[in-house]
Swiss-Prot record:
PROSITE patterns: ATP_P_PHORIBOSYLTR. GO terms for molecular function: ATP binding; ATP phosphoribosyltransferase activity. Belongs to the ATP phosphoribosyltransferase family. Short subfamily. The lineage of its organism: Bacteria, Bacillati, Bacillota, Bacilli, Bacillales. PANTHER family: ATP PHOSPHORIBOSYLTRANSFERASE, ATP PHOSPHORIBOSYLTRANSFERASE ATP-PRTASE. Lacks the C-terminal regulatory region which is replaced by HisZ. The keyword Transferase applies. It comes from Listeria monocytogenes serotype 4b (strain CLIP80459). It holds the Pfam family HisG. One of its GO terms (biological process) is L-histidine biosynthetic process. Its EC number is 2.4.2.17. Its main location: cytoplasm. This is ATP phosphoribosyltransferase. HAMAP family: HisG_Short.
Length: 213
């Protein structure tokens, strides 16, 4: 039986994903002592894991290097769809928010400048509102953009809001909820249908049980 390759997002989401996979009966013990390794093979099941950055999960899945990926909905919303989004894992929950300084007027008719790491999401949001805005893409700490006068407001993902508060920003609108999703390579789904759907069924059962608690 061909080993399923699962691409995981490094960092906090990785820990939540591994915990969920283990509850679903997936052997993740090979990842216990990671050190600097990025590829792991289960010794008891035909499964291996790849640890990569969030945006690279989609790349590995798209090109079939990974059969399955676990990645945040924020990454999926920003990229072109070249995969099947199979399951909301209900972990890594946060939301897209519009935030700015206390003197920001969201109802102003003046053309706004919006700083964000997610220009596609920002464009969609303001297009749906019928607003024409200028969008500046920032890769780093987007929170300082309105404080320094680079932008009128920002669009970013928010979990607790503590980083916004520390930088003197307020949330003006909660936009889209986000959570981790399980995505599958289109060719892999055809070739490994039984294995993949078995994994999905196991995960769905765990999610259902946790939701009922």
């Amino acid at each position: 039986m061909k080993a399923l390759k699962i691409a995981l997002t490094k960092g906090r989401l990785e820990k939540d994903a591994v915990a969920l996979l283990e509850k679903a009966g997936i052997d993740c013990s090979s990842m216990t002592d990671k050190k600097r390794k990025l590829i792991f093979h289960s010794s008891t099941q035909p499964i291996s894991f790849i640890l990569v950055k969030a945006v690279d999960v989609m790349t590995y899945v798209k090109h079939g290097v990974a059969d399955i990926g676990i990645v945040g909905k924020d990454v999926l919303m920003e990229a072109s769809k070249s995969h099947y989004e199979m399951l909301d894992l209900e972990i890594g929950k946060c939301q897209f928010c519009l935030a700015s300084t206390p003197d920001f007027d969201p109802s102003s008719y003046r053309r706004k400048i919006i700083a964000t790491k997610y220009p596609t999401v920002a464009s969609k949001f303001f297009r749906e509102k019928g607003e024409d805005v200028e969008i500046i893409k920032i890769e780093g700490s987007v929170e300082i953009a309105p404080v320094l006068g680079l932008a009128d407001a920002i669009i970013d993902i928010v979990e607790t809001g503590s980083t916004l508060k520390e930088n003197g920003l307020l949330i003006y609108e909660k936009m889209y909820p986000i959570s981790a999703r399980l995505i599958v390579n289109k060719a892999s789904l055809k070739q490994n249908k039984t294995q993949i759907f078995q994994l999905i069924d196991q995960l769905e059962q765990v999610i259902k049980e946790e939701r009922a608690e």
